[in-house]
Amino acid sequence: MSNPLTTAPTSVSFTSADRVALTMQALDLLSPEERDLVVWFAGEVRRNAWSHGEAGKRIGIDGSNIGRIFNGNYAGNWQNVLEKIRTFRHLQAEREKMTRAEFVETSVWERVRQTCDMALINQMPAILVGVSQIGKTHALKEYMRRSHHLVRYVRIPAGGTLRDTLFAIADACGVGAGVNALRVRARILSALNSRTLLIIDELHQLTLAKPMTAVKVMEFIREILDETGCGLVVCGTRALQQELLQGQMAAWLDQFEQRCITRTVLDDRLSDRDIGKVAEAYGVAEKPDGDTLKVLRTLRMNRLVKLLMLAGTLARKQEMPTTWDHFMAAYTAVNR
């Protein structure tokens, strides 16, 4: 197969992994599946801070060709490169299954999954609201890991400027490094399409930014929807609902909210069933007594998991199965 990129303009150059940038005009000449592969691999190189030599070893080609691939002037067998990236991507997915911590499918996960599916399938925005530490972010990242589609996840920087937010989104899309602010908007729009889902987490951080900054960020998010047709999920705490969507910016954001296919508001606490599922995953099978259950009902997901991990450590030291007694001992120790 001839290289479809050799005639594309080469306008970006970089010499190290922390400057990975793609020539989006070149990627436009690829098929959708091929384009997604290259964008994914560029993101892996950037995220892991691999040198070109290291990136080449990962997929089995000479490191000197990595820059040529990303810039669009690789003159070798392009089909061979794409197949190597496919193989590497599959291998990475299998390794993640072996090394990642067990994920517990709670009701939070189910509602997050449904929200993301609706946004992606219908190519529409959705709003996800929930208290801090309930497990939203963990579930969103798990959705990204499991998805067969290209899912991009970005956290809004606290109190950041429009430029900060643009580069955070560009970085999540794998197109942020080595590009100036004037071109980053176009890069973002080129990196997203109807097959992708963009997840914007911590949107409530805009409440810490200047009002006009928040408006400009939301207007750019609307521009992404209009120009790319991607699915979109915006996620945040109650501040998102109370201060952005219903507060002083309500008039600005009304059009955005009207376009949303769904607004999902998560429960403020874990259900007893969810608590039981998480506990069982960490080796505690029996039901808690009344006093322990009262404590459990005050906890959110992140704290529950950390206490169960501490309980497991205590149990291993005693060479015993983990019980609720170990859990309460851990709870007492950290609350002295």
Where are these regions (language model features)?
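C-terminal alpha-helical "lid" subdomain
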Residues: S2-N71, G76-N80, D268, D272-R336
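DNA major-groove recognition helix of helix-turn-helix/homeodomain DNA-binding modules
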Residues: Q79-E96
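Pre-Walker A adenine-sensing motif
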Residues: F103-L120
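Walker A/P-loop nucleotide-binding motif
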Residues: I121-E142
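Sensor-1/coupling segment of RecA-like P-loop NTPase cores
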Residues: I127-S132, R222-A250
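AAA+/P-loop NTPase substrate/partner-engagement loops
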Residues: H149-C173, A191, C260
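A short helix-turn-beta junction within AAA+ P-loop NTPase domains corresponding to the substrate/partner-engaging
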Residues: H149-V151, Q246-D267
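Mid-core helix/loop region of P-loop NTP-binding domains shared across ATPases and GTPases
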Residues: T165, G176-G231, R269-K277, D291-L308, ...
